[in-house]
Amino acid sequence: MKKLRLSILILAISAFFSQSFACTSILVTRKASKNGSTMITYAADSHTRYGDLYYLPGGVHKPGEMIQIFDYGDGRPLIQIPQVERTFTVIRNANEVGLGITETTFGGRAELESETPAIDYGSLIRLALQRASNAREAIKVM
């Protein structure tokens, strides 16, 4: 009983002081699932980000068109970048061709934060899903 109480106490303390505000992902490959499906889950475990399910319609875009990049956390405008000719429809962490991206991050060390950020991880995920049809293309986009 004493060991159980100690274990629970250690677990509680480590959860409080660890990077417990990181996001959680569960990945299942087709060889690991019973029916051959690939599955991903994503939970933004932060107390400030509650589940959202955004929809970004794909389409064909005009040459010279620009898109505004916003901070994923607070929504402030960051930079504008050129739009590509064709984008895929995105619903949260997956696109219309079946590419899915999830992440496990935490706030990070304060001294590494840029005072003039241009793009953040949430925007990178969205751009990759809009512009890539597979993981290799997504890496190139990022």
Give the residues covered by each predicted segment.
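Positively charged n-region of N-terminal signal peptides that target proteins for export
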Residues: 1-6
